[in-house]
Amino acid sequence: MPRATKMRVVTVDENGKELGDAKWVDIPEPDHFASDGFAQIESYVSRLLGSSARFTSIIIATPDQQMAVSLWQRAGVPEFTLSVEWRSEAERERAVRQFFSERGLSTSHDYLAGNGGVPDATRCLGYFLPPDVQFITALTKDVLRQIYHLREQDALDFSFKEHHDAV
């Protein structure tokens, strides 16, 4: 599967309703780590929390793009976001909800979005996080291990972006 080079970005409210106009943005080539991807997470989380941009994001993905999670910070509030194909990944959705509930983290968003021409194919979930590098690093590693069954030594791609003009 070829790597996507553009992404349509739109701001949505907590119910998934679009706010404002969407725009197409370039997706930069990710930083690729062929092994020990987990060892890179803390430095990216530090960059995220240290950013003064209005909106900053990190996408952490496997090189084959079969798994991806995102960390965001908007107006100083960090979030962990992910999506699941809820019809075919019901067990994963349940595991994600349980994982964050057990840690007392509240939902920032939970809505269905379109994918592949199916209007409600993808469940988009987000959770508010405390602005703590160690906590977010450990949580991210736990999600990758427990939900996605990745290992410390696995390859990971990181896309870091500061959006100074974000709303």
Which stretches of residues belong to each language-model region?
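Structured alpha/beta or helical-core interaction and ligand-binding surfaces enriched in interleaved
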Residues: 2-167
